[in-house]
Amino acid sequence: MKLIGITGMPGSGKSAITKLAEKYKIVVVSMGDVVRYETLKQGMPLNPENVGNTAVKLREIYGKEAIAVPCLNYVNEKYNNEDFVIIEGIRSIYEVNYIKKHAELDIIAIHSSPKTRFERLSGRNREDDSNDWNTFVERDERELNFSIGRVISLADYMVVNEGNYMDFVNDLENTFKKIINVN
Amino acid sequence: MKLIGITGMPGSGKSAITKLAEKYKIVVVSMGDVVRYETLKQGMPLNPENVGNTAVKLREIYGKEAIAVPCLNYVNEKYNNEDFVIIEGIRSIYEVNYIKKHAELDIIAIHSSPKTRFERLSGRNREDDSNDWNTFVERDERELNFSIGRVISLADYMVVNEGNYMDFVNDLENTFKKIINVN
């Protein structure tokens, strides 16, 4: 089995992978799925509090490599027969390194400029709404503090999502096809 | 004046900017130029020891924002009449933030996968020469510790250098022309 990790800053367009996954019938696992699965495994009902507590507990148990450890378990338990599994929401280089040590993993990073991402996320074309801009920068900062900058810089594939959306989806699909060996 | 900063992991192909700079007659300033200039300003002859000591001293004086502070001074003193100046070798987000606060700066990041960069730098096609691979990873690590991952992830433009070299140079030139408003 080969894992395909999708990463990118907020608003870069990572969700485009969902449509491609459907088209090529490839399972998508999000880090959130893993936490919910772990919550259920502990016999707790799924509600925001339990899921939140499980996330904290996983980080206590596995340190910087959480949620990679339960993620790999989850994939192996549930999707052992799949040739490819997409993992959404990878943002820590520790998680990447852990998974790469135990499985085959290719990382696709999606890049858009901060200006473009801000416009997408805020639905506006003006950077002078400083409150929104600060919120945007803080959100970026949180992701970067998880070491997503390292994941992006060391990505196996980089797809730029800056101009025409269909061009981007096309580039992403071509990258995707390279990984899953479809011509 | 607008500054154009070039960043990218080792072996990504940053030096391609030199030819473009010549073609469009745009000055290129490297962080090394700045340190040499500061060395001379202090009346010291240019030798590796003096240049090294100056770099250390600049970091002591300006902290994380070195070498951005003397770099901006250098550009303003020497190239005040230029419309555009390229700055090579930006690798710290603190330097980027400092320069953006005081001048107009667009960052172009160049991305190649670790595998491709390793092959370029080692001139080999095998990752199993573990000694070389470790050296490569350590060099990456040093750059990432300077926060180059943040500079890359927050770049205004991303150019991928993965396949055909002329395609890459072409993409880089198109990006470059967008910034300097040439059609």
UniProtKB/Swiss-Prot annotation, chains A, B:
GO terms for molecular function: ATP binding. Coiled coil: none annotated. Keywords: ATP-binding, Nucleotide-binding. InterPro entries: NTP_hydrolase-rel, P-loop_NTPase. ATP binds at residues 8-15. The keyword rRNA-binding does not apply. The keyword Transferase does not apply. Pfam families: AAA_17 (PF13207). HAMAP family: UPF0200. Belongs to the UPF0200 family. PANTHER family: DEPHOSPHO-COA KINASE, UPF0200 PROTEIN MJ1399. This is UPF0200 protein MMP1282. It comes from Methanococcus maripaludis (strain DSM 14266 / JCM 13030 / NBRC 101832 / S2 / LL).
